[in-house]
Amino acid sequence: MKTSHSGYPHLGKSATSALLAALNGLSAASWPESDLLGPSTFNIGTLEGGEKHNIVAPSAKALCEVRMVADLPGIKAKVADIISRHPDIELNWVFEYPEALLEWEIDGFEAAPVAFGTDVPRLRDEFCGRRVLYGPGSILVAHGPDEFIRVPELIDSIAGYKKLVLHFLS
């Protein structure tokens, strides 16, 4: 990209404009859905670019996330295809892992698909062949300024953890 004074944008090439065009393409894309896990989601998590308001931006970057419920290779190909339409944009894969199908039919627990990441897929099968996600609180308040867990939920989770231990030891 090429910097210039913002009063003469035709003398430069804006990295932020190029990146926004690519991000708009990704935002407008449709992503796979699963009858079991629900829809995949796309999020532009961070966006950085430019030096000052009166300079055509010489650089920009974004960190995005697709939480996929199926077909990791297909999603990667789709992202690469969309980005390939924007020759000034470079694609770097930072982190990836496939959808996680866990043990979900356990007596005494309600099961539901969730749209958030977990380290569970990284647990090695030989050490942890049966895996679940369980814990108090709500993902709907996670990562926000008012994140919290209600005390009764925390106390009730003790019994839940005990049930899980007994389930996995049986």
For each feature predicted by the language model, list its residue ranges.
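Metal-dependent amide/peptide-bond hydrolase catalytic core
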Residues: 1-170
